[in-house]
Amino acid sequence: NLDDLKVLAAIATIADIMPLKGANRLLVQDGLKLINKGRVVPGLRHLLRKLKLEEHITEDDFAFTIGPIINASGRLYDDGASSVLDIFVADWRDYQLPYKCGKLIDINEERKKRLRNAIDSIDLPTHKSTPLVIYDPDWGEGIVGLIAGKLCEKYHVPVIAFTRTKSGQLKGSGRSIPGIHLKNVLDSIPKDILIGYGGHEGAEGLSIKKENLKRFEKEFEKAC
């Protein structure tokens, strides 16, 4: 069903923090129209009911309520994304849909708690005018993007937050501000520092070796 795909594409566009311009904006506008006409898959309908968002859905509802709930399960659990997919492909005969949607909301509350604890553990100055690179081995891969986003919002500078993976590498997530294209910044960093990276102007994911952290920090600040 093309309408179902339009709705899912709209949610994915906002949840992945894609720039809302051109085709992306059209996708989101079409998705919002369909949702507000009630033309949504059963799983999303149950989720909206749980959230009491059945009246008029806005872009802010997508970005600050629906998107974080959908993302939370995959951030915190290795198989979390599959549980979200299970909800979105289910039909009306799945009597467990209300429970599954409630579970997603509970997981998002857990995600909020972990994020608060992580932010509270960071010792940073009141003001910061230069790009920021931070690292903590215990944060967990699922919340580094959220940490970067919070600090980017607080200091209004580009931020990369790193944590340690099971393999010993550092996995990072970045958020940027208008005027600084994060993908272009990482394109300009020496390739021997980066194991891999990908994203767009506002958000990036990347991996480096731990021994390259200090060097990355210097190159990142210089490139910004």
Where are the regions a protein language model picked out?
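Hydrophobic helix-and-loop "lid/oligomerization" segment in the mid-to-C-terminal part
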Residues: 2-222
